[in-house]
């Protein structure tokens, strides 16, 4: 919403979500499957987009073998096999060369120092411009930061509020264009 209000064209590619998207989004590509989403993103990358904001990780794990239809009751315990899903930011790395890329690193149960380290590693491995790092246990907690902005040099800056986060994202975009 913030980027749109500051004059930027925004395209949204989303999976299954409970978040309601703003009415102003002209192009909203909804994908029910992570692989379908990756194909859409690769198609969009052919248009040489200037800025990519990867706001949420696609499923880290996906169901190994999906079963169509209903499973009959009284069949006993179910074991569901999971496998690691494709890392979209890595898959898009070469297709987005030259673009500003901002990612998010959302973790739980780790120290802030380790979170920043993982965010910086993401920047290096996926060729990101910057990453917004945050932790589940901090979300919505009074006095806890909204996250940390981590740059390509490993420097990190506290983002106290959602507005701080939006301003940081906008600044990164404006400073790298």
Spans of model-derived segments:
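A cross-family phosphate/adenosyl-ligand binding-site feature
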Residues: 1-177
């Amino acid at each position: 919403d913030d980027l749109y209000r500051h004059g930027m064209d925004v395209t949204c590619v989303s999976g299954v979500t409970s978040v309601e998207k703003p009415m102003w989004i002209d192009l909203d590509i909804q994908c029910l499957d992570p692989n379908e989403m990756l194909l859409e993103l690769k198609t969009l990358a052919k248009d040489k987009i200037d800025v990519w904001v990867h706001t949420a990780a696609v499923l880290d794990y996906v169901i190994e073998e999906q079963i169509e239809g209903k499973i009959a009751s009284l069949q006993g315990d179910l074991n569901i096999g999971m496998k690691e899903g494709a890392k979209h930011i890595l898959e898009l790395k070469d297709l987005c060369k030259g673009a500003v890329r901002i990612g998010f690193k959302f973790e739980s149960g780790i120290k802030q120092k380790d979170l920043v380290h993982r965010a910086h590693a993401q920047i290096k491995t996926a060729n990101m411009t910057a990453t917004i790092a945050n932790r589940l246990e901090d979300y919505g907690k009074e006095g806890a930061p909204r996250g940390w902005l981590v740059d390509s040099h490993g420097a990190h800056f506290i983002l106290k509020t959602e507005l701080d986060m939006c301003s940081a994202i906008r600044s990164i975009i404006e400073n790298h264009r």
